[in-house]
Design a protein with these regions (language model features):
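Nucleic-acid endonuclease domains
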Residues: 1-208
Length: 208
């Protein structure tokens, strides 16, 4: 029998950390009140989505929980996914995706962006692009997961290396230098084959 008490890493509560964090929350709470954004789960995501959208030239952010994350003044939409630089496997995760939404991911007017952050506010780079194959591929993943009886078949991921080398996305650097990103990615799951064994070059948006 599994002992659930063995799971996790338990440490004594750090009062200094607690006080400093809730002090920062007080500032955030004032912003929530000022702008009427009282949903704790979405305010940080909205701010991050807006920053990514701004970096990529999209002027409008979605303040609702449903739909694409940003759009241009034209009918060009942006779907933003976030990842931490400390993650061993960097990927774009699509939660509870319907078959209809999966199909729309491959539309010509939908760009997918994977933003990689080193901290709450430091955006390192964005991997973004579009590819018609993403829609059918995502749809096939969901159907296969349903057939296998997965509890959440609509939650699927696309690895950063697949976005770059399978779907032709490129990297836009924000707060990371080009000479540093290759070394950074060598230690990430999926990149060893491409960057070390095959010596593949990373595609950047400032290159033809």
């Amino acid at each position: 029998m599994n002992n659930t008490g063995q799971h996790g890493k338990f440490e004594k509560i750090n009062d200094e950390f607690l006080n400093e964090t809730f002090g920062a929350f007080e500032v955030l709470e004032a912003i929530q009140t000022k702008y009427g954004k009282t949903d704790n789960d979405t305010i940080i995501n909205e701010a991050r989505d807006a920053m990514v959208a701004k970096v990529l030239g999209y002027g409008n952010v979605n303040t609702d929980k449903h739909g694409w994350d940003a759009k241009m003044d034209s009918e060009e939409f942006l779907e933003v996914k976030q990842s931490s630089a400390s993650a061993g496997h960097i990927c774009a995760t699509f939660n509870d995706t319907s078959l209809e939404k999966a199909e729309e991911l491959g539309k010509d007017n939908v760009t997918i962006a994977l933003a990689v952050w080193s901290s709450l506010r430091n955006l390192l780079f964005v991997v973004y692009g579009k590819n018609r194959k993403i829609g059918p591929d995502m749809k096939a993943k969901i159907i296969t997961a349903k057939e296998k009886g997965h509890i959440r078949p609509g939650t699927q991921s696309i690895s950063m290396n697949d976005l770059l080398f399978k779907y032709g996305f490129k990297i836009k650097l924000v707060n990371m230098k080009k000479e540093d990103i290759r070394e950074f990615l060598k230690n990430k799951s999926g990149f060893k084959t491409y960057l070390i064994k095959e010596n593949r070059q990373l595609p950047f948006y400032d290159e033809a």
